[in-house]
Amino acid sequence: MLSIIVPTLDEAEGIAAALAALAPLRARGAEVIVADGGSADGTAVLALPHAERVLAAPRGRARQMNAGAAAARGDALLFLNAYTRLPADADRLVGAALARGAQWGRFDVAIAGRHPLLPLIAGLMNLRSRLTGIATGDQAIFVARAAFEAAGGFADIPLMEDIDFSRRLRRLARPACLRAKAVTSGRRWERHGVLRTVLLMWALRLRYFFGAPPDKLARLYGYAPRER
């Protein structure tokens, strides 16, 4: 079984549509688990009709995804941002990749939006990921449960949890880099400026690779999880 784990925090505006898009996968046997980090806008209530389980999880993306994985029944796990849409046959593609011997992988990403640079940025993200074996959350990382447990799950850090997880998984095996596209929202790129966002993300990533603490990077990014 494929378990799709969706961490949420104040996603009321789009969560129903995001989860409704997963209905065909659920009809084919996948389960959807929403791990909510204490939304104040009713996200958890809106998610209830569209998921097998809606969990109240400790706030923080890594904590929420680990909580979802602990509750999941599947032998394959897929971690999906609430603002990212999977390919229609994602369940079959993941199953085929794991059946071929992959231990983990990710999809190519497309960035939805009107800015002409977004397709180029997505293409470079996919190329970089294919060359380095590192995936980001926007690429809908999937993993066999045994590999998830062998890697130790997500580290309890407020930012770069996807990069850290990929690095540990890469020690087990190279990822299956699927060319089918997960489509992620370009809202943060367009809201803050495409070039500015690219430069900020690369600066944060370089600092992380050179040892900067993730909590400091989270503050620079403008993200600091509130305590529950």
Positions of predicted regions on the chain:
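Conserved donor NDP-sugar-binding/catalytic core segment of glycosyltransferases
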Residues: 88-117
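Short aromatic/hydrophobic "clamp" motif used to bind/position activated sugar donors
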Residues: 77
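A conserved acidic beta->alpha catalytic loop
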Residues: 21, 36-44, 84
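Acidic helix N-cap motif at the loop->helix transition within catalytic regions
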Residues: 13-17, 39-50
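Conserved donor nucleotide-binding strand/loop of the catalytic core
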Residues: 30-33, 44-71
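Hydrophobic helical membrane-anchoring modules
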Residues: 167-228
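Cell-envelope/extracellular polymer assembly enzymes that use nucleotide-activated donors
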Residues: 1-3, 31, 164
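Short, acidic, metal-binding catalytic loop of nucleotide-sugar glycosyltransferases
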Residues: 20-29
